[in-house]
Amino acid sequence: IGGLDSAFRCLFSGSTLVVAETRSPEAAGQAIASHQVNVLPASPTFLNLMLLSGTAQKHDLSTVEIIAYGAEAMPQKVLSRLAKAFPNAQLQQKFGTSETGTIRIKSIGNESLFFRIEDSDTQWKVVEEELWLKTPSRVLGYLNADDGGLEADGWYRTGDLVEIDDHDNLRIIGRASAVINVGGQKVHPSEVEAILNEIEGIEAVSIYGMAAPITGSTVACEIVVSGDEGSRTWKRTIRNHCRGKLAPWKIPSSVKIVDSISVNIRMKKTIR
């Protein structure tokens, strides 16, 4: 829905829509510099790839005034690095679903993951951490499929888990489908990811569940690192860092070093 929103906004405002030749940070950087792009909409994963690849240093991206991100949870570490790499750009979080369309929200600050819903036509509530929406634009149903999260009274269960603060501001935690069940204990991948991102040398993280004979699942991780230490060393480093910060069942039991994090065609982390 984010791509459609960007395209329609360009049509409505008479703006020029620039499409990079390939889905790569290098191609995006070249397109931004060549066409002096003002607005950069992208997923957090792709924005992190741009940071890791040094795209901002290779190309003049000073014309970027707004970076709009969404489609998946944004790691705090990536958001903070973006703010430093693009000091003159406004970082705007976006939210929407194919079933409801985009929802008008406002980020609390450039380096804050919290936002508030400012759409007067949208009702919202949080049920067991899951965000529910009711909008005039909600779809009626699916062709040749069950109604899934579409409720008869007009509500839509988004499948997005959120944290809500005392001021009714929301923060996306992750997808309900990505929660790892370790012997009956629920583990949010984003919580583990945030702790691992505190470790110097870890550039990107993917947390997922791996089958285990006794607990059913165990927490596993793939990491992109800047050093040349092996998986065994990093596993020890991760366990030492997580001890006291995470419950024992949330600490990754499997650590795999990879060159890049697996993403889907929409440049979002692959949910396993």
Regions found by a protein language model. Name each.
Residues 92-99, 116-119, 208-210, 256:
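Beta-strand->loop->alpha-helix junctions that form or flank phosphate-binding loops
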